[in-house]
């Protein structure tokens, strides 16, 4: 019996793994604006109970905000060194993980396309 969980629990932005695997440059796509600061997970009492057979998962959830913050610090460092090109939403749209608002989803999609189009030449230069 095997249980699989999202890898984002332990490495939300696996950029350093890409470097360790031999990449010399990476394109990082963030789903939150650069100003986003991840907070500790809510509902600890619920996930501690639900995941009691998986103490390492509980620890990963408990520390996820700290790992994310370190990931973002690493991203900024690599971006400054010219080794990472970072795409992030240019503005914040208030959308929760479990939102089912088609209009808001379309706005977020359109923002991503617009942000990408605005930096397409920069991406070509970075990759060449």
Stretches found by the model and what they are:
Residues 1-128:
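Patatin-like phospholipase
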């Amino acid at each position: 019996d095997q249980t699989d969980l999202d890898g984002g629990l332990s490495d939300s932005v696996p950029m350093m793994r890409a470097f360790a695997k031999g990449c010399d440059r990476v394109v990082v796509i963030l789903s939150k604006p650069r100003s986003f600061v991840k907070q500790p997970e809510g509902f600890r009492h619920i996930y501690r109970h639900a995941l009691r057979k998986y103490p390492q998962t509980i620890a990963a959830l408990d520390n996820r905000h700290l790992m994310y913050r370190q990931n973002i610090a690493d991203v900024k460092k690599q971006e400054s060194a010219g080794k990472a090109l970072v795409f992030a939403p240019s503005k914040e749209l208030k959308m929760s993980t479990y939102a089912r608002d088609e209009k808001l989803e379309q706005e977020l999609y359109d923002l991503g396309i617009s942000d990408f189009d605005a930096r397409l030449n920069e991406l070509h230069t970075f990759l060449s």
